[in-house]
Structures are given as C-alpha cells and as structure tokens.
C-alpha cells in the first residue's frame, strides 16, 4: 500500500469519487468501512449504484480524480468506461 493520507472534508458520507481514490491508493473495502464507520453492505451499495450507471461520470469527477493522481486506466476500470471514450471525453471538455 502506498503512503497516502486522505484529506477529504466529509468523513460522514462516502461518495463514489472518494471510494475510487481510496481504492486506487490501496485501501481495502474493509479499511474504508472502518474509516467511514460504515457497514460493509454500504460499500457494496455504492459500488452497485455505479455499476447500474446511477452515478454519472462528469468532467468535475475527472478533474477531482486526477488531482489525486488516479490513472486513466484505473478510472476506466472503476467506472467501466473504454479508454478511448475517456480520452475523447477529456479532449471535448478542455
């Protein structure tokens, strides 16, 4: 696990962006549960919402993830986006 200390402002509510950043930096789902004082099924619900496309990926999300050095490949994996689509998305929003 890399040395990464999250400095998110709100530890009371886990959103998918924070989840992706923490997973990228090597935090397990169980460790995230302890950090946010959540039950494990809450993490699964957040992931399930993203899989059902209830969570829209926006340029604001992209900029946020890049500010935490999340790679494009990892973003594609977590959001189930094709790499070419992500590159097109980045170019169109510049």
Residue ranges and their predicted role:
Residues 2-7:
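DNA-contacting interfaces and partner/effector-binding or oligomerization modules
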Residues 23, 29, 42-47, 66, ...:
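Broad hydrophobic/π-residue packing in well-ordered secondary structure
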Residues 9-27, 54-70, 88-90:
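Short, amphipathic alpha-helical "recognition" segments used to contact nucleic acids or chromatin
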Residues 41-61, 84-94:
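Short, solvent-exposed alpha-helical "recognition" segments
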Residues 27, 33-34, 49, 70:
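General helical structural elements
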Residues 32-33, 75-76:
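Short alpha-helical "recognition helix" segments of helix-turn-helix
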